[in-house]
Structures are given as C-alpha cells and as structure tokens.
Amino acid sequence: MAISWKEMNELQPRVMKLLYNSIEKDRLSHAYLFEGKKGTGKLDAALLLAKSFFCLEGGAEPCESCRNCKRIESGNHPDLHLVQPDGLSIKKAQIQALQEEFSKTGLESHKKLYIISHADQMTANAANSLLKFLEEPNKDTMAVLITEQPQRLLDTIISRCQTLPFQPLQPKAIEDRLIEQDVSPHMARLLANMTNNVAEAVELSRNDEFAESRAKVIKLYEVLHQRKGHAFFFIQDQWMPFFKEKTHQEMGLDMLLLIYRDVLSIQIGNEDKLIYQDLFQSIKQHALQSTQQSVTNQILAVLEAKKRLHSNVNVQGLMEHLVLMLQEG
C-alpha cells in the first residue's frame, strides 16, 4: 500500500500543511513544482494530492476508500496521467499526446490532473510545448511537475508553477518508517544513516547482501582493534572476495566510517546517537582507550580511502594502507 497522508505529513510537514490548507480553502494552484533530492517523497505526495483532488468524500485528506482513491492507488484512474521519461528523455510527442488527451472532457468528471516525473529530462521541444500548455491553464486542470534538478527547467516554466521544496529526510524519520515495516532496530538505524531515500532503505533492508556487508564490516573493526596481526589476512581472505565492486567497497567504507563516528560520539557524550548500539561495549572500550585526535585521524583515514577509491588505484593496496592508518590512529 502507498504511503498515507499522515505518514507523508511526518516526512514533509511544511509541504503537506501547505497543500492541506490550500485544499481546505479551495485555493489549489493550477501548477505545482515539487523539487528535492531523490527519495524525499515527491511522487508519493503528488499521488496523495491527486487522491484529494478526485476524492468523492471531498475532504482535505483523501478517504482512501472511495472509488477514485482506489483507482489512483491501483494506477488506473482515467483522468490522472503520469508522464515519465521515454528512455533518457521526455519527448515532445509525449507532451503533445498529453495535450490532446486534456483537450477532451474528463471521463469521470470535469477534473483532470497530470504528473510529470523527472520534468528536468524534457527535451527543449517538449519543454516549449508544455510551456504553451501552462500559459493557458484550465481551472479544472492541475499539473504537478517533479524534479531533482530544478535548475535544468526553463525559468518560464518555473515562474508558472508554485514551487514546493522537499527537504532531505531526517534519519529518525527514516528509521521509524523502517521499524514500522518490521526492519530490526539496529538495521533500521544503520540504513537511516546511509541513505535519505526511504524506498532505497526498504530495498536494502530486504537484501541479504546488505546484512552480510554489515557483518563483514563489524568483523574488520574487531580484527583491527582486537587481533591486529590478522587484519591483513582478513582483507585478503574475506574482505576482497566479498566486496568485489567499487560501489560495494564504498558501501563497506561508509559502514566502517559510522563505527568510528560512534566511537567519537561516546567520547563527546552523545551515546544516545550511536548507530551500532549492539557494539556498545567494544566501541566504548575503544573510546576510553583512545584520544579524540586519534579517532578523528581514523575517521579522516576512512574518508581519504573513500576519495581514492574513485581514482585508478589497486583496491587491495588501498585497503591494506587503510589498515595501517587505522591501527596507527
């Protein structure tokens, strides 16, 4: 089931309050621009707005049970149109087809709504066609444009829309959403600190490889600080065969970075912010036996390794150098 109005309100309170008040006062704009980073709920909010727009109950929040709400939920409402890139771009023909469709009377009512996802990917011709469409708004037609890169849109298109900025999601909000979906608390907290995209976090939580990656990272940390002589063997025999791709290596380094951040959090008295709460005892011991400067150096070493990972380097050599830096502190 799609996200509810209440859930969306918790993720993007400013946006949802503005939409709620506009619906209540019957002052909805004819065109909105939802802009923000990937995973901030722009499409979910657009579909919730569509439900409110078409809902037979007529409230500010959709009832979720009438025929129109259910048809939008299943993606088959005849007067709601979703335009997405065809390949790498949204083409002029797609906008022209939309205009032709909207020149007809609504099949279910006098209302029509269209959503253009990744609006920044419109070709120049498509954007110009849309501009003409926006210049002659119909009072019963609403447009919602969605983008992660508003700077790529024509200024004339932006000026004809009410822009609603979607803020990056706070880790706590993502963590709560994941726990609601039966993700374990320790995994939810880690995921919430690795991505601000709820959908991506949910997908990763269901990926066995992510859990295995976490276990490998914890093992490396333990070897680094409890069995120092085995660290190079671990890199060769377990780390490298498992983290084969650079993107996977980067994820492993991100996880490792968060462990050292936890150590620093304990040192400065922020124990409530720990991500690896199940490692509390070993992390606390590390914190007590180290200076803040040495832990800061370890954090900087991981960040430098991440940076060098994207250049043409031997990854095993990079990891072995990182081991030396982490053990030196």
UniProtKB/Swiss-Prot annotation:
Record field: catalytic activity = DNA(n) + a 2'-deoxyribonucleoside 5'-triphosphate = DNA(n+1) + diphosphate
Q: Which InterPro entries match?
A: DNA_pol_HolB (IPR004622), DNA_pol_III_delta_C (IPR015199), DNA_Rep/Repair_Clamp_Loader (IPR050238), P-loop_NTPase (IPR027417)
Positions in coiled-coil regions: none
Native organism: Bacillus subtilis (strain 168)
Q: Please state the protein's primary subcellular location.
A: cytoplasm
Q: Where in the cell is it found?
A: Cytoplasm, Nucleoid
Give GO terms: molecular function aspect only. Answer: 3'-5' exonuclease activity; DNA binding; DNA-directed DNA polymerase activity
UniProt protein name: DNA polymerase III subunit delta'
A Gene Ontology biological process in which this protein takes part is: DNA-templated DNA replication
This protein's assembly is summarised as: Component of the DNA clamp loading complex consisting of tau(3):delta(1):delta'(1). The DNA polymerase III holoenzyme complex contains at least 10 different subunits organized into 3 functionally essential subassemblies: the Pol III core, the beta sliding clamp processivity factor and the clamp-loading complex. The Pol III core (subunits alpha, epsilon and theta) contains the polymerase and the 3'-5' exonuclease proofreading activities. The polymerase is tethered to the template via the dimeric beta sliding clamp processivity factor.
Keywords from UniProt, A to Z, are: Cytoplasm, DNA replication, DNA-directed DNA polymerase, Nucleotidyltransferase, Transferase
One GO cellular component assignment for this chain's record is: nucleoid
Superkingdom of this entry's organism?
Bacteria
A Pfam family that the UniProt record links to this protein = DNApol3-delta_C
Enzyme Commission number(s) from the entry = 2.7.7.7
